[in-house]
Amino acid sequence: MTTLSPENSLSARRSATFILEKRNPPIDKAEWDSFFDENGHLAKSRDFICINILERGLHPFVRTEAWKFLTGYYSWQSSRDERLMVDSNRRRNYNSLCQMYEKIQPLLENLHGNFTETRNNIAYDIQRLYDKDPLGNVLIDKKKLEKTLLLSYVCNTKAEYQRGFHEMVMLFQLMVEHDHETFWLFQFFLQKTEHSCVINIGVGKNLDMLNSLITLLDPEFAEHLKGKGSGAVQSLFPWFCLCFQRAFKTFDDVWRLWEVLLTGKPCRNFQVLVAYSMLQMVREQALLECMSGDAILMACNNLIDLDADELISAACVVYSELMQKEVPQPLKEFLL
């Protein structure tokens, strides 16, 4: 076991306070532009920018460009001219992938049963997706969404299509203007978050680390979850598969959490601390009523309309507490 840095503990607690008190507004276009020199090179440190995003968030007018840096679509070391070239190359590569897909689609249909099944699943999921805002205006182009999901499935050997990806990609489509941006940002998001939302890659690891975290920080609750409440934690996989998308009030809240995950602040795999913070919301009721695993799961599923800033702040406090503990090596390596 290892004790983690007390400086990190103080920093995380300070961030939690800043988030809740909203001491400074989200980073707007003028401030974002001030982070770069006349050639478009970074004039502030990447660390400085990421901490500010954690503590303050991004104005919607800045989000698209900032996410290109956060995901790795753009290099933090690039100039403005280099980014124009990168964007042009990404567009060209996307078009090449689309052409390739058109050519091999008949082959996939004839030789790969999984392709037909996946295409049907995507079509079914998209058909059920509500695509209008409260005023009845159409938000997204379902045909383009289907195309992005199919192309992602064919091209991504690590992350096969899973239920819920259609909702995630929809948020990328709402954020950006062009199809190639939607496609690449989603691919880079999966990579940057270490495929933590992919059920056959990162979700199981998240659940194991969540169990370790509960055992370390809340032994009483851990005992209940091993006894009468058994099975509850392992059933929380939809939280990770959807990156908590269904827990929030608005799309802005979802984007707010996701961009924090992309910063790597205050630690890697922050999503597990977020899940722990959500579990703490039902802890008292679970222990008081001696709830079963199914009842705990139902209570967790009823956690909706959450405020992203409040949840991020709570998870920062958890990280601060964790820094003062003797942390098992696997958990330490997972978070650092």
From Swiss-Prot:
Q: In which tissues is it expressed?
A: Expressed in testis, specifically in elongating and elongated spermatids (at protein level). Expressed in the sperm midpiece (at protein level).
- Domain Rab-GAP TBC residues, every copy: 57-265
Which Gene Ontology molecular function entries are recorded, alphabetically?
actin binding; GTPase activator activity; small GTPase binding
Task: State the SMART domains in the record.
Answer: TBC (SM00164)
Query: Which domain of life does the UniProt lineage start with?
Result: Eukaryota
Q: Which residues form a coiled coil?
A: none
Disruption-associated phenotype: Male mice are sterile, characterized by defects in sperm tail structure and diminished sperm motility. The mitochondria of the sperm-tail has an abnormal irregular arrangement, abnormal diameter, and structural defects and the axoneme structure of sperm tails is severely disturbed. Sperm mitochondria cannot form a proper mitochondrial sheath at the subsequent mitochondrial compaction step, although they can coil around the flagellum.
What InterPro entries does this protein map onto?
Answer: Rab-GAP-TBC_dom, Rab-GAP_TBC_sf
Q: How does it assemble?
A: Interacts with ACTB. Interacts with ARMC12. Interacts with TOMM20 and DNAH7. Interacts with RAP1A. Interacts with RAB10.
PANTHER family listed in its UniProt record: TBC1 DOMAIN FAMILY MEMBER 21 (PTHR22957:SF489), TBC1 DOMAIN FAMILY MEMBER GTPASE-ACTIVATING PROTEIN (PTHR22957)
Biological role stated in the UniProt entry: Acts as a GTPase-activating protein for Rab family protein (s). Essential for the establishment of male fertility, and is required for both the production of normal sperm number and sperm function. Plays an important role in the formation of intact mitochondria, outer dense fibers and axoneme within the sperm tail. Essential for sperm mitochondrial sheath formation and for the interactions of ARMC12 with VDAC2 and VDAC3. May be involved in acrosome formation and cytoskeletal reorganization during spermiogenesis, possibly by regulating RAB3A activity.
UniProt protein name: TBC1 domain family member 21
Taxonomic lineage is: Eukaryota, Metazoa, Chordata, Craniata, Vertebrata
